[in-house]
């Protein structure tokens, strides 16, 4: 086919969509170029046959940043790209979330999306281009897909309002970094971090983005009109109406009764028994439904039962109404040797969160397409299988753990002190020890508590809450503090974190069409009510950061020296600074402007290192008495060391009031003596006196 190209203006940028020139054997391939600057090649391939063995939709999204895109060669021994970076993993999730709900129910053919950044600058993030390219590639692929999807990034300034698709530089001055994706009718996904914006400002940003990315959707429709392949002739399996009716007739009441059991383990055990009974009764002979078909129908009855109960105003699975937060149990300082710790329990969800303080050298080094940079704040989320009472894989963090950790990080980051106020590296680890819904928001609450327990001067405490939605026709119910089952069976996952003043993070994933502005507004208002409730209970345990750092945390001393003294502190080949660190067990970081940060495992170690630095950088003061050591004796006097690297001369005439024939009659090399600084000439030579010390002391020097 001949190449098809569509251009459109999108905010500050010109976007070009091109297909038919590259990767023509893929089901769909689009090259997205932004301002002749950023180029992302997106390919989509769909398997023609479904994998009968899989009980889920096998969609995979791979976003990859090639170093050649920025004119760089990879570091390391092998000199080629390795495993996905955290940024690549997070962007893959960002692309996956809005497209997944748009594939038809029951579609089980494998679909693989690969987004490759092939050219980039240091001006904008390529993620929006990758999202647009994914939507366009799916639209022309022929794969059943209810798109297209548009996407946009939004910034916010108090003076100028909302800004579409900001540059990195513009984001630095922004109070908001939000990515929104959706169809022409509805918003499907929101990912954001903010600096205490109001709920109205956050909702305004979502609606602003939705309006602005309509131009993207229109351009993709125009591209598809010229370049799309025929849509696959795929039909969903007919609904097993008879099987569903049989299960509901005989087991419907028992299933409904099981969902009144409030303890998760007991409820799961009862539902497991019922499922076994259903399979034993209905999947018994040839010609009857298979066990997998019966289990799928049983799951559908579960789905309908829970949703009907909720929209009809019945109590939720654990007996709560729609607005109640589960009971909280909050503890801080639970681990004796850590720098800060908290145990946050909300119902059957529990997070053990630990904060650790380190030196500037402990900051994470990030090698990105934009260049190397250091990150002084890390938040890591771990979800071991025992947290849900299961055996499972143990190992490195998966995509879900990386995503949840980043959401928790975004939630608390805006409330951390600046490096000029608190120059420590901070690492927070959230260990999920129990889980039944909203473990990422438990991590937010626990992180805030652990940081305050460690003495990190937080600007304000932060709490988070997960909201849910069940919508049947015109009836809907918004749920506060959702359980795991409510997340799975509901239509929306809506997580909001913030302080008492405003929102710091908002994440939203919607599985259905037709989420209105009214629903989002109600959800934000209900989330604020819950957040303030949780913050109130957190503040009863610890309402502000401790006045002092933990005794287990390293001590930091900041000082400044003249820039011409830096080389003296470092020494030849780093010998001086290395010796100080080895002898005092402290670490020293020196900046080009003379700023010095000294970190010691104890106050004594840090102070000892500070005194050594002061000794090296100090200047001899005229009229001050020093205790020095005789380094060398000559015929006309003695050289005495009064400061590290600084010797002065005591002339023979300055040794005593009496006449001195030989210097060695008064002094010996290695002897400690008190000397008075008489003068320092313009060449830095120091003139000392021993005989004038007594008079100087008498005068109060």
From Swiss-Prot:
Pfam families: KH_1 (PF00013), PNPase (PF03726), RNase_PH (PF01138), RNase_PH_C (PF03725), S1 (PF00575)
All copies of domain S1 motif, residue ranges: 623-691
Reactions mediated catalytically: RNA(n+1) + phosphate = RNA(n) + a ribonucleoside 5'-diphosphate
Main location per the UniProt record: cytoplasm
Record-listed Mg(2+) binding positions: 487, 493
EC number per UniProt: 2.7.7.8
MF-aspect GO terms: 3'-5'-RNA exonuclease activity; magnesium ion binding; polyribonucleotide nucleotidyltransferase activity; RNA binding
SUPFAM superfamilies: Eukaryotic type KH-domain (KH-domain type I) (SSF54791), Nucleic acid-binding proteins (SSF50249), Ribonuclease PH domain 2-like (SSF55666), Ribosomal protein S5 domain 2-like (SSF54211)
Location in or out of the cell: Cytoplasm
InterPro entries documented for this protein: ExoRNase_PH_dom1, ExoRNase_PH_dom2, ExoRNase_PH_dom2_sf, KH_dom, KH_dom_type_1, KH_dom_type_1_sf, NA-bd_OB-fold, PNPase
Cofactor: Mg(2+)
Domain of life of the source: Bacteria
SMART domains named among the record's database cross-references: KH, S1
Entry keyword set: Cytoplasm, Magnesium, Metal-binding, Nucleotidyltransferase, RNA-binding, Transferase
Function comment: Involved in mRNA degradation. Catalyzes the phosphorolysis of single-stranded polyribonucleotides processively in the 3'- to 5'-direction.
Family listed: Belongs to the polyribonucleotide nucleotidyltransferase family.
PANTHER family hit by this protein: POLYRIBONUCLEOTIDE NUCLEOTIDYLTRANSFERASE, POLYRIBONUCLEOTIDE NUCLEOTIDYLTRANSFERASE 1, MITOCHONDRIAL
Summary of subunit composition and partner proteins: Component of the RNA degradosome, which is a multiprotein complex involved in RNA processing and mRNA degradation.
NCBIfam families in the record: polynuc_phos, PRK11824.1
Record's protein name: Polyribonucleotide nucleotidyltransferase
Organism: Pseudomonas savastanoi pv. phaseolicola (strain 1448A / Race 6)
């Amino acid at each position: 086919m001949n190449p098809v190209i569509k251009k459109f203006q999108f905010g500050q940028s010109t976007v070009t969509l091109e297909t038919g020139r590259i990767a023509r054997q893929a089901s769909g391939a689009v090259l997205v170029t932004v301002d002749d600057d950023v180029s992302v090649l997106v390919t989509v391939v769909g398997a023609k046959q479904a994998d009968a063995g899989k009980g889920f939709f096998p969609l995979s999204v791979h976003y990859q940043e090639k170093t050649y895109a920025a004119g760089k060669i990879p570091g390391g021994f092998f000199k080629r790209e390795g495993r996905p970076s955290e940024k690549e993993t997070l962007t893959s999730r960002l692309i996956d979330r809005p497209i997944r709900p748009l594939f038809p129910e029951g579609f089980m053919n494998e679909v693989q999306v690969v987004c490759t950044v092939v050219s980039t600058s240091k001006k904008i993030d390529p993620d929006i281009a990758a999202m647009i390219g994914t939507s366009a590639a799916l639209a022309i692929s022929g794969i059943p897909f209810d798109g297209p999807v548009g996407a946009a990034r939004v910034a916010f300034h108090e003076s100028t309002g909302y800004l579409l698709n900001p540059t990195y530089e513009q984001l630095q001055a922004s109070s908001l970094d939000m990515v929104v994706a959706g169809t022409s009718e509805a918003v499907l996904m929101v990912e954001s971090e903010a600096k205490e914006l109001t709920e109205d400002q956050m909702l305004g940003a979502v609606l602003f983005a939705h309006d602005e990315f309509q131009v993207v959707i229109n351009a993709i429709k125009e591209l598809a009109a010229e370049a799309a392949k025929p849509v696959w002739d795929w039909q969903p399996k007919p609904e097993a109406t008879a099987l569903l009716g049989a299960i509901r007739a005989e087991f419907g009441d028992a299933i409904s009764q099981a969902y009144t059991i409030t303890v998760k383990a007991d409820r799961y055990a009862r539902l497991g028994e019922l499922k076994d009974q259903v399979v034993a009764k209905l999947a018994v002979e040839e010609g009857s439904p298979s066990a997998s078909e019966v289990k799928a129908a049983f799951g559908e009855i579960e789905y309908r039962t829970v949703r009907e109960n909720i929209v009809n105003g019945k109590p939720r699975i654990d007996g709560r109404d729609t607005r109640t937060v589960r009971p909280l149990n909050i503890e801080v300082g639970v681990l004796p040797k850590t720098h800060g710790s908290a145990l946050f329990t909300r119902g059957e969800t529990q997070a053990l969160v630990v904060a650790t303080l380190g030196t500037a050298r402990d900051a994470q080094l990030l090698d990105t397409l934009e260049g190397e940079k250091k990150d002084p704040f890390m938040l890591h989320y771990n979800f071991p299988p025992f947290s849900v009472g299961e055996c499972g894989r143990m190992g490195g963090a998966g995509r879900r753990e990386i995503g949840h950790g980043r959401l928790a990080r975004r939630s608390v980051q805006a409330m951390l002190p600046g490096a000029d106020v608190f120059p420590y590296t901070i690492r927070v680890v959230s260990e999920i020890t129990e889980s039944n819904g909203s473990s990422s928001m438990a991590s937010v609450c626990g992180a805030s508590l652990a940081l305050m327990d460690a003495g990190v001067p937080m600007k304000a405490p932060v709490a988070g809450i997960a909201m849910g939605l069940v919508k049947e026709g015109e009836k809907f119910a918004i749920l506060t503090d959702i359980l795991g089952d409510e997340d799975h069976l509901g239509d929306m996952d809506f997580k909001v974190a913030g302080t008492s003043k405003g929102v710091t993070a908002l994440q939203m994933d919607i599985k259905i069409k037709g989420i209105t502005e009214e629903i989002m507004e109600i959800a934000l208002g209900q989330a604020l009510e819950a957040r303030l409730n949780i913050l109130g209970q957190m503040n009863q345990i610890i309402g502000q950061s401790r006045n002092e750092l933990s005794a287990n945390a390293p001590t930091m001393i900041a000082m400044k020296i003249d820039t011409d003294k830096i080389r003296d502190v470092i020494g030849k080949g780093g010998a001086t600074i290395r010796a100080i660190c080895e002898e005092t067990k402290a670490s020293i970081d020196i900046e080009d402007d003379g700023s010095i940060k000294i970190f010691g495992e104890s106050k004594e170690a840090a102070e000892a290192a500070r005194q050594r630095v002061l000794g090296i950088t100090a200047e001899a003061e005229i009229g001050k008495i020093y205790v020095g050591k005789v380094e060398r004796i000559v015929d006309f006097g003695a050289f005495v060391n009064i400061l590290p690297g600084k010797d002065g001369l005591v002339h023979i005439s300055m040794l005593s009031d009496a006449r001195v024939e030989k210097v060695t009659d008064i002094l010996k090399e290695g002897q400690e003596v008190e000397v008075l600084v008489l003068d320092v000439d313009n060449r830095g030579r120091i003139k000392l006196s021993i005989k004038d010390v007594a008079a100087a002391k008498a005068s109060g020097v």
